[in-house]
């Protein structure tokens, strides 16, 4: 499913969002990458909340990060799945929350007139407003961006069916982890973003993916973070868990160039097949 050109969309500027950045053993990476990107796009530092694993990490981050470049540091829990759950329970239900990784190097946007049909993203604030507005339009809570920074595969469309919502940058109306509409992740590490995509889709009947913007990041290669725990076995275990627990949506994909096992998402209960 898609919607027409972005040119017809009006932009609201009133979304009271926060940006939650979980980070582990990457204080310098966060300082030099994601925080610099947010500064470049004129994001209010008071909106930026950094979630660390323990008190020791908290002190390291306070000593490393530039004062005034973020709002606050919150001590959460180790491992990305439990930390995502901690973040969901930290904020009020319905709060607009951006989840952002600590190693984002930038963003590109689709432009059919540009070389490779892509250019540097003009406005991150507009993308954030677009995402939350599309969620309201389609009565769902999770939105994300295109996972691959390659204009050849991107387009000026918005998806609202089952799509993989990449974990490095996405937004949601905070669901919490409790109650019939809560979203609680079971996976602690690898493929937690696939699990989140499926759980939101199952709860809401749709997720939003903006095809016209993508992140620049180092998947599977940046030291620290998930790489502290990741092995090919852990990635395979996560992929197999997805197929076992969401057989109506998930299929194992062993053909990715990364060399790591991946998951393909499609709602198999529907007749029409679309690429993820």
Q: Which sequence ranges carry the predicted segments?
A:
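Hydrophobic targeting segments
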Residues: 16-21, 38, 47-50
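Arg/Lys-rich, intrinsically disordered low-complexity tails that mediate electrostatic binding
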Residues: 1-10
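Conserved catalytic core of nucleotide-sugar-dependent glycosyltransferases
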Residues: 107-194
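C-terminal catalytic/acceptor-binding lobe
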Residues: 12-15, 26-33, 186-276
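Active-site-proximal specificity loops/subdomain of glycosyltransferases
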Residues: 51-100, 105-120
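A structural signal for short, well-ordered beta-strand segments and their strand-loop junctions
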Residues: 97-101, 141-146, 207-211, 251-254
């Amino acid at each position: 499913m898609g919607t027409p050109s972005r040119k017809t969309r009006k932009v609201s500027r009133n979304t009271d969002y926060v940006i939650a950045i979980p980070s582990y053993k990457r204080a310098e990476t966060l300082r030099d990458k994601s925080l610099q990107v947010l500064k470049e796009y004129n994001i209010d530092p008071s909106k930026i909340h950094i979630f660390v694993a323990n008190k020791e990490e908290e002190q390291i981050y306070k000593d490393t990060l530039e004062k005034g470049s973020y709002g606050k540091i919150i001590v959460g829990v180790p491992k990305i799945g439990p930390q995502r759950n901690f973040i969901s329970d930290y904020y009020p239900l319905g709060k607009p929350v951006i989840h952002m990784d600590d190693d984002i190097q930038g963003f590109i946007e689709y432009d059919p007139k540009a070389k490779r049909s892509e250019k540097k993203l003009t406005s991150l604030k507009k993308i954030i407003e677009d995402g939350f507005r599309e969620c309201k339009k389609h009565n769902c809570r999770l939105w994300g961006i295109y996972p691959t920074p390659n204009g050849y595969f991107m387009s000026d469309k918005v998806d609202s069916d089952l799509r993989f919502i990449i974990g490095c940058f996405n937004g949601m109306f905070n669901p919490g982890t409790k109650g019939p509409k809560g979203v609680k992740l079971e996976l602690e590490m690898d493929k937690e973003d696939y699990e989140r995509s499926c759980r939101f889709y199952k709860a809401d009947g749709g997720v939003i993916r903006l095809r016209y913007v993508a992140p620049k990041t180092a998947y599977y290669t940046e030291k620290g973070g998930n790489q502290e725990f990741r092995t090919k076995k852990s990635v395979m275990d996560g992929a197999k868990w997805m197929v076992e627990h969401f057989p109506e949506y998930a299929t194992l994909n062993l053909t990715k160039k990364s060399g790591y096992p991946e998951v393909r998402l499609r709602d198999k209960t529907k007749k029409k097949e679309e690429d993820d």
